[in-house]
Amino acid sequence: SAASDVYKRQGVQGEMCNRGYNTMKGYYKNPEATAEVIDKDNFLHSGDLGIKDEDGNYRITGRIKDMIIRGGENIYPREIEEFLYKLDGVKDVQVAGIPSKKYGEAVGAFIILQEGVKMQEADVRDFCRNKISRYKIPKYIFFVNEFPMTGSGKIQKFRLKDLGLQLCKEQGIEII
């Protein structure tokens, strides 16, 4: 199966899947939910993206549902977030897909600045230029004070899309 192939390939990102005696057989009295996460070969699909290194260890690199698909290109938000953390003055950053008429989704960066730091969108784009692929450079850059959070303190990535659309509307930015 495609799931088992991920385990064999080093350096190739894919969905983290597992099976074995310690893996659940399914959700109690819920065959529909079970069918969504367990394939015909009994692999449990975690929804996490990961990569196998040269030592045979796996590293989680993100979540499948967070992946941005821009004009056929798969963009992993965590990769861009890790890059933007290197920009002086950035305290925290989250990247999410913003709906796009032309590309399906465009990259949106939500940045919390360190106290007292002033930054413009152009500063972020200049930092990215010639260092990451053009299609990964954020089309939309929003400076925010906080991210939408759950009661337990986790960032609600799925709400960033709506926040991005709202901020575009408030700022008069046309969605292309």
Description of each model-found segment:
Residues 16:
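Glycine-rich active-site loop/lid that clamps phosphate-bearing ligands
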Residues 1-7:
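Short, small-residue-biased leader/transition segments that mark boundaries at the very start
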Residues 5, 20, 25-26, 33-36, ...:
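AMP-binding/adenylate-forming catalytic core of the ANL superfamily
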Residues 13:
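Phosphate-recognition beta-domain surfaces
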Residues 7, 118, 174-176:
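N-terminal non-cleavable signal-anchor helices
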